[in-house]
UniProtKB/Swiss-Prot annotation:
Signal peptide: none annotated. One of its GO terms (biological process) is pyruvate biosynthetic process. It comes from Vibrio vulnificus (strain YJ016). The gene is ubiC. One of its GO terms (molecular function) is chorismate lyase activity. Its EC number is 4.1.3.40. Pfam families: Chor_lyase. Pathway: Cofactor biosynthesis; ubiquinone biosynthesis. InterPro entries: Chorismate--pyruvate_lyase (IPR007440), Chorismate_lyase_/UTRA_dom_sf (IPR028978). Belongs to the UbiC family. This is Probable chorismate pyruvate-lyase. It is found in: Cytoplasm. Substrate binds at residues 82, 120, 165.
Amino acid sequence: MNQPNSLYLALLIEAKWQNPEDFHFSSDFAKHWLLEQGSLSRRLARHCQHLTVELMRNEKSGVGQLTMQETQGLSPEICLIREVVLSGDQTPWVLGRTLIPETTLADQPYDLATLGDIPLGLTVFSAEQVERDALQVAWIETPQGRLLARRSRLWMNHKPMLVAELFLPDAPIYSRESV
């Protein structure tokens, strides 16, 4: 993993999450991105010719390797940790970290552990039963300035996973920030 991604990931894991009603959004445009209930992957794909996934990590981890914040949204069990960078036309846009409990991996129509470079959102939002709850947002201070992030719990066929996403400096969420 390269140095900027390592730093971004560490900052994302330690984010100070807030409920949307308590958060100061920089614009209505950013608010719509952060509160998106559907697939972020699909939304990103509409802003580029080629949406790609760089898989940085895809391995099971014990409960002891998760933060207290992360375990609050899930049952305490071994999770698959999937960390990726989503890029639009070769420009990094979003760093994602997903925690998928072993019980969520079981009995699904898709093998979430072997997605590789397929965007998770495209797979999850293809399932019959998908819901998002516990949506939170954050500003994350980086050497490049403040960046926006969101975290939510996705339910796929009534089984949870925790998804955190950091919008990198060139992400489309910032394209209308000054408008």
